[in-house]
């Protein structure tokens, strides 16, 4: 019976520590500076502008897109050649043993 109060106390301590970590987290400015240092971007240097989804949609709808031209495949690739699968005349009563990879006549 002593294990259930012990488990309850342990669960409460875990809950309190999790709430403490969440509520006492680092301020936003400290986190941003740490992230900039990790990306090797000097503090104070301008980061490229980030656009929202509606702004991007507006920009794309107002710009006329040029059609993409498909480039020809490089000539270094081997071109596929269809094999001539015409029916060859076989002698009568020839048996094809496909599991043996041969034909017996």
From Swiss-Prot:
Record's keyword terms, sorted: Cleavage on pair of basic residues, Disulfide bond, Glycoprotein, Hormone, Secreted, Signal
Highest rank taxon of the organism: Eukaryota
Glycosylation sites: 88
Modified how: O-linked glycan consists of Gal-GalNAc disaccharide which is modified with sialic acid residues (microheterogeneity).
Subcellular location: Secreted
CC annotations in GO: extracellular region
Name used for this protein in its record: Somatostatin-2
Source species of the chain: Ictalurus punctatus (Channel catfish)
